Amino acid sequence: LIPYLRRFHKDHPEVRIKIINITSIGCAELLENGQAELIVTNYPNSRLSSHTKLQTVLEFRDIFVANPDYFTMGKSPLSMENLLDYPILMLAPKSTTSEYLHQVFAAQGLKLLPEVELNSNDLLIDLAEIGLGIACIPDYMLRNRPGLEPVHLKTPLPARSAVIAHHEALQLSQAAQCFLKYFSQI
């Protein structure tokens, strides 16, 4: 998102931008209540209504990562059931990621019981780096993290996406319309 904000701000320095950093579920609630024109959210997001117009910004996969100094995973991919033998670090229950992971594990007949639940992927990474557990993070966040390695699963988690969304029934401001155009060039 930062490169788009940087470019928009450079092209339109007169526009004041309000940014709120909350969960994807919270973003969807702001959009539905008319408190935000545009949101960037993980998708799928159960709180988005059928009146929400979506534009994909990024496709990604959630991955599990561990510090090999603390967790020797070996070369063989783990089953999801075997993964549950380790302390799992993940985002808090009121997040689309948590909903998604619980659904994926439940589809395999498994109950996901995380050791740690936080509101920050960065903090999950920090805790995984010091060996407190195996963190579930978006794959794009693993870059430049030499102390962490992906945990290979027999069945990789399905891909998801980050989307920019707006309510189709509401008229967007000229600034919001202009900002959306940056994403049509992806």
Name each model feature, range by range.
Residues 53-63, 139, 146-161:
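Short beta-strand->loop
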Residues 4-12, 35, 81, 98-111:
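Ligand-binding cleft/hinge of the Venus flytrap
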